A protein has these predicted regions:
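Membrane-anchoring alpha-helices and their flanking helix-loop junctions
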Residues: 1-86, 98-167
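Solvent-exposed interhelical
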Residues: 89
């Protein structure tokens, strides 16, 4: 896949998946209306803002790496030709999923909406099942020892403190 095709495909998939999961659906649940803050502490909203600010660039950077380095998209119908192990992928194997859940949970805390916390937990569970049942077996088949080495050094969900460097 050419870089331009990968970029366009990734942009389309971004609108279909993360923008819907972390934008449209949370909006449909909360209408982005503030409720009394969690624990009756207004400062808790700052934690929500921090999660959103961390998550949005994480999704964008990871999508760009799929297109420009992987020469593919995050979508299963147009997977990357190269294993992406740079950027946030040096810290965690699933930065797009981690970032999407961070944005959802950030909105839950910002707007103090328990329903959005539940939605975020369900989305993470869905991502976990997809990763275990489909993505990891597919990546093992596609990239073999390179992916095995990556898995041995980079955690699935909780980021490493230092970046991993492939040898």
């Amino acid at each position: 896949m050419s870089k331009i095709t990968a970029v366009l495909g990734s942009a389309l998939f971004f609108v279909v998946a993360p923008a819907m999961l972390a934008g449209l659906i949370p909006w449909s649940i909360t209408h982005w209306e503030f409720r009394p803050p969690f624990l009756a502490v207004e400062a808790t909203r700052l934690a929500g803002v921090a999660l959103i600010i961390a998550g949005v660039p994480g999704v964008l950077d990871s999508f760009a790496r799929f297109a420009l380095e992987g020469l593919g998209t995050p979508a299963p119908i147009a997977p990357p030709r190269n294993l992406v192990v740079s950027g946030l992928y040096r810290y965690v194997r699933n930065p797009i999923y981690v970032a999407v859940v961070a944005v959802i949970l950030g909105q839950a805390v910002l707007f103090a909406d328990w329903r959005l916390l539940g939605y975020g937990a369900l989305i993470w569970l869905f991502f976990h099942i997809v990763v275990i049942a489909y993505e990891e077996p597919t990546l093992r088949q596609s990239f073999g020892a390179e992916y095995e080495s990556y898995c041995a050094n980079v955690p699935r969900w909780l980021p490493r403190l230092t970046p991993w460097r492939a040898v």
